Structure formats: C-alpha cells, structure tokens
C-alpha cells in the first residue's frame, strides 16, 4: 500500500511526523504538507501565485500552499506511481461538529476524495498523545473494509488525548454542533495600528449521545463518514412546492 500523508499544521508539526513514522511500519508513505501552519484554510486552492514544492532531506515534500494545494499538486503534478490512500493529520486539536467546515485537515482528505481516492482525516483532542492517534490510524486501516473506504466519502477520526491503553474503544458518530462564536480580539500592533484576531471556537451546543463530541468526551475514538454533497435533501420537496405555488399563481 502507498499512502499520501498531508495536514494543515505544516510539515514541521509533531502530529504529521509521528503519523508518518507509524504508518511507515505498515505501508510506503509520501509526505506532502504545507510549509507553514495553514489551520482553518478549508478547501481553498492557490490560484494567484505559483506553487513551489520543496524536496526535503528526509524525502518529504513541503509546499508554499494550502492543504488542498498539497494533495492536488502531489496527485496531479510531481508524484509518480499509484497512491492507494490519503491520510491527513494528526491535527493538533479536534475537528468535530462545525469544525469540519473550516478544517484544512479535512480539506486535504476531501481533495483526495475529489481525485478518486479513499481518504482519512485524523485529529487529536489535545496536543500530547500523538502516538495514540497514530496507533489508532494504523489499527483501523487494515480493518476497514474496502467498501467502507468509499472514494465518495472520507472517514473523519477524532481521538481523545489519552494514552492508547486508556481509550474505551471506537464509536461511529454523527457530527455534533457548536454554539455560534462571535468573539473577535482587538489589539494594537507596535505601530499603534488596530489589528484583529479571530477568537477561539465556541463550546459545543449539541454534544448529546451519538455525536462525535459525546464520544471523545467519554474516552472513545469517534468515527464519522463525511460527504462533500451539501444538498439539504429534506428541504428539496418543500422548496419545490413553494416554487410551484409562487410562480404558478
């Protein structure tokens, strides 16, 4: 098996280095990751400046672009040979609920899906036990049936920040919800000009049983299938009925 590994924290991040080391025990691994932290880049692509992949001494690649750039460029540009799976992570911090909208970690996996490959995104609910998350991924990959690694979807994994032996197991979950966050931090820079920082994420609003928030909070690894189709199917019929009523009067 040949695995392409990327992330949004940058090639230097501890999470991706631990993940690549562990994955190399079960597969051939190619790392192509951003040259700096690109957290919350979502699925943005760089269209207004050239991308420059740099081949590092250890064989990895870093790119002056987003997570989606890295996967797109690797698979369509400079990598030769077949890739069987895309794995993105290990993110420093969870990607649950509404986090998935902004996440560059998920975006790298979704780009692999868009290019026809099965893909996994993995995040740690903290910054300590990266080895735990890496072991979880290596444990799951051989066990996931081929049909579960559907190129039309990705698997989103969130791991409690615990020693591996303290994990309670795995739970398949739906996404929860966070409360709306409107915090912006206003400061002055050294030139006395006003600057702003986007504030931290809000607390979970829906962390009921069955959600990813609930699973991780209670010591379980959450596993959530994610699709790129954003159609609100439950609203199609009512919207169609409204349209017919409004325009057939």
From Swiss-Prot:
Q: What class of enzyme is it?
A: hydrolase
Question: Which Pfam families does the entry mention?
Answer: SurE
The record's remark on the cofactor is: Binds 1 divalent metal cation per subunit.
Q: Name one GO cellular component term.
A: cytoplasm
Output the InterPro entries linked to this UniProt entry.
SurE, SurE-like_Pase/nucleotidase, SurE-like_sf
> Catalytic activity annotated for this protein?
a ribonucleoside 5'-phosphate + H2O = a ribonucleoside + phosphate
Q: What does this protein need as cofactor?
A: a divalent metal cation
Source species, domain of life = Bacteria
Q: Which positions does UniProt annotate for a divalent metal cation binding? A: 8-9, 39, 91
**Single Gene Ontology MF annotation:** 3'-nucleotidase activity
Compartment list? Cytoplasm
The protein's UniProt keywords, in alphabetical order, are: Cytoplasm, Hydrolase, Metal-binding, Nucleotide-binding
Under Enzyme Commission nomenclature, its number is 3.1.3.5
Cited function: Nucleotidase that shows phosphatase activity on nucleoside 5'-monophosphates.
Q: Which family does it belong to?
A: Belongs to the SurE nucleotidase family.
PANTHER family the UniProt entry points to = 5'-NUCLEOTIDASE SURE, 5'_3'-NUCLEOTIDASE SURE
Q: Which named protein is this?
A: 5'-nucleotidase SurE
Where is the organism placed in the taxonomic lineage, from the top?
Bacteria, Pseudomonadati, Pseudomonadota, Gammaproteobacteria, Pasteurellales
Gene symbol of the encoding locus: surE
